[in-house]
Amino acid sequence: MTDTTERGYDRHMLEALVCPVTHATLRYDAEAQELISEAAGLAFPIRGGIPIMLLNEARQIRA
């Protein structure tokens, strides 16, 4: 058993991070390399293994 998700993202890091808008938990999208905040309707990119948790870098996932 390992503490990394598919493509090597650390599960412990994911558990420690929350949405900067709603403080809700995030879902890891391995294919898109994004952290998804369902509560805020935002997707935060992961670049070079580093989550970019800035609102101006987030992508809206719903209208």
From Swiss-Prot:
Any Pfam family hit: Trm112p
GO CC terms: cytosol
Q: Do you know which InterPro entries this protein is assigned to?
A: Trm112-like
Please name the PANTHER family in this protein's record: PROTEIN PREY, MITOCHONDRIAL, ZGC:162634
Q: Which family does it belong to?
A: Belongs to the UPF0434 family.
Q: What is this protein called?
A: UPF0434 protein Pden_2369
**Natural source organism:** Paracoccus denitrificans (strain Pd 1222)
Which taxonomic lineage does the organism of this UniProt entry have? Bacteria, Pseudomonadati, Pseudomonadota, Alphaproteobacteria, Rhodobacterales
